[in-house]
Amino acid sequence: MAFDKKLLDIVACPVCKGKLEYDKTAQQLICKADKLAYPITEGIPVLLENRATPITETV
């Protein structure tokens, strides 16, 4: 099942309540403010803080 990008208008980061970005390749929703990635399982975003993984920016 594919992720519906329309959900980006209504979902928010559960930590900071900020906007999330969709990473199609990794099938994750990214919160740049908190540097967290939330998995998408079978098209459903798992917006639980304990399921998020920290992301690091490579320069």
UniProtKB/Swiss-Prot annotation:
GO cellular component, one term: cytosol
Family matches, as InterPro entries: Trm112-like (IPR005651)
Gene3D superfamilies: 2.20.25.10
HAMAP family tied to this protein: UPF0434
Similarity-based family: Belongs to the UPF0434 family.
Protein name as catalogued: UPF0434 protein Sputw3181_2540
Species: Shewanella sp. (strain W3-18-1)
Source taxonomy: Bacteria, Pseudomonadati, Pseudomonadota, Gammaproteobacteria, Alteromonadales
